[in-house]
């Protein structure tokens, strides 16, 4: 019965099975059988004639007729062939029936079927033919080896003189004078007996019986399971004892000498062991060919999305402080970072950490700083191209280039603010003051640029070799390394990714802003001289509006409590250099959910201005501009007054900007607010006190502030 698994399995095709069987194996076995016939049953080959001693008693043993032997030759051949062959067939049948369901589970399983010549040969048929065929060939080979040795040696059997009946008178001399006779002086009439008496070494019974016993015993040892503790030993001992009996009968019946039997045992056992190990592979099935399964591909999307926001803060120190790539990989022409377009469904919330580092310099707790934002993250494969994984952005520390970028940024914001509110919803008395303010801002910017150019010519050019190196890390965000610089000129890094107009202001919020302005105008009785809000980037104009309204109304004072966050205890960050001059200011245009962060001096931590305490006297803002002049001080502009780094050239770290809403001191110009407050400060909030605001009072206060600022610039 063939198992279902065997039936369902597709058989293999073999082109060499039948040709080898028909043209190689069968001819060899047939030739051995034919040779054995001529050697055993015919007198075509005569044994060698060997001399003997006169009246040798060892050769004068009684002769037992062939039909009187305990195990005649034909019986020996049949037993040596039939018993092992029957045992092999029965064993293969049992193995096929019991182990057919274990196909492919190990090297000892049943072999699969093979198609050859249009016929399907299952494992039982092929294994049986193979093992029995090798056994038959071994028997023939053993008999041939024995006959060849016997014919070559011609040793006499113990009954040689009995069947030869030598005639000593034919010698012409007496046995005493010549005891060793080499002539043929046999006078017996049984020529067949005389011929067989000349072939005794080795014993044919011993060789054939030993071969059969050893061959079938090795088969039992290989096929029968160890679960049967006694079956295997019983079968092995049975065949071994039978072989021993066959050999010993030759000694007891004086058919062979003891040495002939022992030699026959050795020859037969050696042939059997060789064929069992090398011809049939110790009766084991060949190992099944296992198709190598390809390694499962890494699911980059699954790995990337499983990295949550909390896991980024639990990484060890080695992960967050990986060294940058080799200089050869980072150097070269700046190239844009490739971005993959994926569906919104693959976006996951992850943490983007930015580390500000100063390489090869001592670490300080006060100088260590880091901040993180939670941004949507596009899932990308974990194994990126090295060219995409590392990038180098060279930003020259040229003041003119920085001013050019800032002016372009301001120009874009001014153009966007011109399209902020629809004409039908904006009254004329609100648009006219806005145009005046814009013109004043442009004039001030031109004057400031001229002054900065003159100062730059006096100071001299900045070395062009000071470039910050930014390495983009897919998992932990960009890492900025600041090379040391000799001069005090700061580097202003402005993100190139600008939020497009119309990306952050909803129709509801714009409508609410218009309604508040209309109500404020009705209460104040006159137009308000402020710039209209920028489309989508609404916080800078809204901040000016709130400050102006609060000053006019004389609302309650509020003072923010600054909370310093020094991340020196975190194992994920590295502190910058102790040198105050080598610093970098990064404006994050992607973080709409965090307040503005300013970089303090090397001995002071970062300060966040978020919490508002009611009942105090002013608004204390974070250091929005991050750079201040330290030479001269005007009355009304203290160390904490906000001066944007857009309008200043010399840095002064560690200051806090304070705006007194009651007196109007510290009010930043619109250009400074636009330069300092970009997309990164949209979410910073202030309590607004809406009150009546007079047009003349606002204009007078703004005019006085501008005059103080101009006087300070001229003094610097």
Swiss-Prot record:
Single annotated GO MF: phosphatidate phosphatase activity
BP-aspect Gene Ontology terms: phospholipid dephosphorylation; phospholipid metabolic process; signal transduction
Modified-residue entries (Phosphoserine), positions: 320, 351, 426, 506, 641
Keyword annotations: Glycoprotein, Membrane, Phosphoprotein, Transmembrane, Transmembrane helix
Pfam families attached to this UniProt entry: PAP2 (PF01569)
Places the protein is found: Membrane
Keyword Endoplasmic reticulum annotated: no
InterPro entries listed in its UniProt record: P_Acid_Pase_2/haloperoxi_sf, P_Acid_Pase_2/haloperoxidase, PA_PP_rel
Source domain of life: Eukaryota
Biased composition range(s): Low complexity: 562-575
Lipid bilayer topology: Multi-pass membrane protein
UniProt feature, compositional bias: Polar residues: 312-321
Entry GO CC: plasma membrane
Modification type Phosphothreonine: residues: 374
Biased composition, class Acidic residues, residue ranges: 437-460
Keyword set includes Zinc-finger: no
Glycosylation sites: 167, 316
Main location: membrane
UniProt cross-references to CDD domains, sorted A to Z: PAP2_wunen
Similarity section: Belongs to the PA-phosphatase related phosphoesterase family.
Protein name (record): Phospholipid phosphatase-related protein type 3
Lineage of producing organism: Eukaryota, Metazoa, Chordata, Craniata, Vertebrata
The encoding gene: Plppr3
């Amino acid at each position: 019965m063939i198992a279902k698994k065997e039936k369902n399995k597709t058989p293999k095709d073999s082109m060499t099975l039948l040709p080898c069987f028909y043209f190689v194996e069968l001819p060899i076995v047939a030739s051995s059988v034919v040779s054995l016939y001529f050697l055993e049953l015919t007198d075509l080959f005569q044994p060698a004639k060997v001399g003997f001693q006169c009246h040798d008693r060892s050769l004068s043993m009684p002769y037992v007729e062939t039909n009187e032997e305990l195990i005649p030759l034909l019986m020996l051949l049949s037993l040596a062939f039939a018993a092992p062959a029957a045992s092999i067939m029965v064993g293969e049948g049992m193995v096929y029936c019991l182990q057919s369901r274990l196909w492919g589970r190990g090297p000892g399983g049943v072999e699969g079927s093979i198609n050859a010549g249009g016929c399907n040969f299952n494992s039982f048929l092929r294994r049986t033919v193979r093992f029995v065929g090798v056994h038959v060939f071994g028997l023939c080979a053993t008999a041939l080896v024995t006959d060849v040795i016997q014919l070559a040696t011609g040793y006499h059997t113990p009954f040689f003189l009995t069947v030869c009946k030598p005639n000593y008178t034919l010698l012409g001399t007496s046995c005493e004078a010549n005891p060793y006779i080499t002539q043929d002086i046999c006078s017996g009439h049984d020529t067949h007996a005389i011929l067989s008496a000349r072939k005794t070494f080795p014993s044919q019974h011993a060789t054939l019986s030993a071969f059969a016993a050893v061959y079938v015993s090795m088969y039992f040892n290989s096929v029968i399971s160890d679960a049967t503790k006694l079956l295997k030993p019983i079968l092995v001992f049975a065949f071994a004892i039978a072989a021993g009996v066959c050999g010993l009968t030759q000694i007891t019946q004086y058919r062979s000498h003891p040495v002939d039997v022992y030699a026959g045992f050795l020859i037969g056992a050696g042939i059997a062991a060789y064929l069992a190990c090398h011809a049939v592979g110790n009766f084991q099935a060949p190992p099944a060919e296992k198709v190598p399964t390809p390694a499962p591909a890494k699911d980059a999307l699954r790995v990337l999305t499983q990295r949550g926001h909390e896991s980024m803060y639990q990484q060890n120190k080695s992960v967050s402080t990986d060294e940058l790539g080799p200089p050869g990989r980072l150097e070269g022409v700046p190239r844009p970072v490739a971005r993959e377009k994926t569906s919104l469904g693959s976006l996951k919330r992850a943490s983007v950490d930015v580390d500000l580092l100063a390489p090869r310099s001592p670490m300080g707790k006060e100088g260590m700083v880091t901040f993180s934002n939670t941004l949507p993250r596009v899932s990308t494969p974990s194994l990126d191209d090295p060219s995409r994984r590392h990038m180098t952005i060279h930003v020259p520390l040229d003041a003119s280039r920085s001013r050019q970028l800032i002016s372009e940024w301001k120009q874009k914001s001014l153009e966007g603010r011109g399209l902020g509110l629809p004409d039908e919803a904006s009254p004329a008395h609100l648009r006219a003051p806005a145009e005046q303010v814009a013109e004043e801002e442009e004039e001030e910017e031109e004057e400031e640029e001229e002054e900065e150019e003159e100062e730059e010519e006096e100071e001299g050019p900045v070395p062009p070799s000071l470039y910050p190196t930014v390495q983009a890390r897919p998992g932990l965000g960009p890492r900025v390394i600041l090379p040391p610089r000799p001069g005090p000129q700061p580097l202003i890094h402005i993100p190139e990714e600008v939020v497009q107009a119309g990306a952050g202001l909803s129709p509801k919020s714009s409508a609410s802003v218009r309604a508040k302005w209309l109500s404020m105008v009705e209460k104040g009785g006159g137009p308000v001289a402020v710039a209209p809000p920028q489309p989508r980037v609404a916080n800078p104009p809204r901040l000016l509006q709130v400050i102006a309204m609060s000053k006019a109304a004389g609302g309650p004072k509020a003072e923010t409590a600054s909370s310093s966050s020094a991340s020196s205890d975190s194992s994920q960050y590295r502190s910058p250099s102790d040198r105050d001059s080598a610093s970098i200011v990064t404006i994050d245009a992607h973080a709409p959910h965090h307040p503005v962060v300013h970089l303090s001096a090397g001995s002071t931590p970062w300060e966040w201005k978020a919490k508002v305490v009611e009942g105090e006297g002013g608004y204390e803002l974070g250091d929005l501009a991050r750079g201040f002049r330290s030479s001269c001080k005007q009355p009304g502009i203290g160390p904490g007054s906000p001066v944007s780094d857009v309008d200043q050239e010399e840095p002064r770290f560690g200051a806090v900007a304070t705006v007194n809403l009651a007196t109007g001191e510290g009010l930043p110009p619109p250009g400074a607010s636009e330069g300092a407050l970009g997309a990164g400060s949209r979410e910073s909030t202030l309590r607004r006190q809406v009150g009546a605001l007079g047009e003349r009072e606002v204009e007078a206060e703004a005019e006085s502030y501008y005059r103080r600022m101009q006087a300070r610039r001229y003094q610097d």
